[in-house]
Amino acid sequence: MQDAITAVINAADVQGKYLDNNSIEKLRSYFQTGELRVRAAASISANAAGIIKEAVAKSLLYSDITRPGGNMYTTRRYAACIRDLDYYLRYATYSMLAGDPSILDERVLNGLKETYNSLGVPIGATIQSIQAMKEVTASLVGPDAGQEMGVYFDYICSGLS
């Protein structure tokens, strides 16, 4: 896992240079939004179950996918979907705090699409649920933090597409 600070420092170090103005500006921006990210993470952590419940209600609960014959029919499959959404929310929050999506590649996306395809998990419905989670989260944390979180939800969706 990498964070915004490590990414900037590593880039300069690889080149054997001091931080340039662009690097300093990236760090300044990261630190200026630090309080916003921490407050958003606290709010998401305190409301994670509600975020997931509302996202499922918006995207999956009344669709064909939850009816007999659907890919989320049976309690076990439904529970696995809820577990995965919780996982995406948690790791998107970690990424938002770090200001870097690398943890999503390392811990979420590597091999996920292939696994879902082999298990018959509908990727379109998964993406729809993540987008619903993005909307619910943005309404909870406000537009600025919601936009920041949206970057990481979109990153997950892009990785699944």
From Swiss-Prot:
**Alphabetical list of Pfam families matching this protein:** Phycobilisome
Q: What is a single cellular component term in the Gene Ontology annotation?
A: chloroplast thylakoid membrane
Q: Where is the signal peptide?
A: none
Q: Which UniProt keywords apply?
A: Antenna complex, Bile pigment, Chloroplast, Chromophore, Electron transport, Membrane, Methylation, Photosynthesis, Phycobilisome, Plastid, Thylakoid, Transport
What modifications follow translation?
A: Contains one covalently linked phycocyanobilin chromophore.
Asked if the Swiss-Prot or TrEMBL record annotates the protein with the keyword Transport, the reply is yes
User: Which residues are recorded as binding (2R,3E)-phycocyanobilin?
Assistant: C81
Please report the record's description of how this protein sits within the membrane.
Peripheral membrane protein
Name any Gene Ontology BP term: photosynthesis
Where in the cell does this protein reside?
Plastid, Chloroplast thylakoid membrane
Subunit record text: Heterodimer of an alpha and a beta chain.
Stated role: Light-harvesting photosynthetic bile pigment-protein from the phycobiliprotein complex. Allophycocyanin has a maximum absorption at approximately 650 nanometers.
Family note: Belongs to the phycobiliprotein family.
What name goes with this protein?
A: Allophycocyanin beta chain
Q: Which gene encodes it?
A: apcB
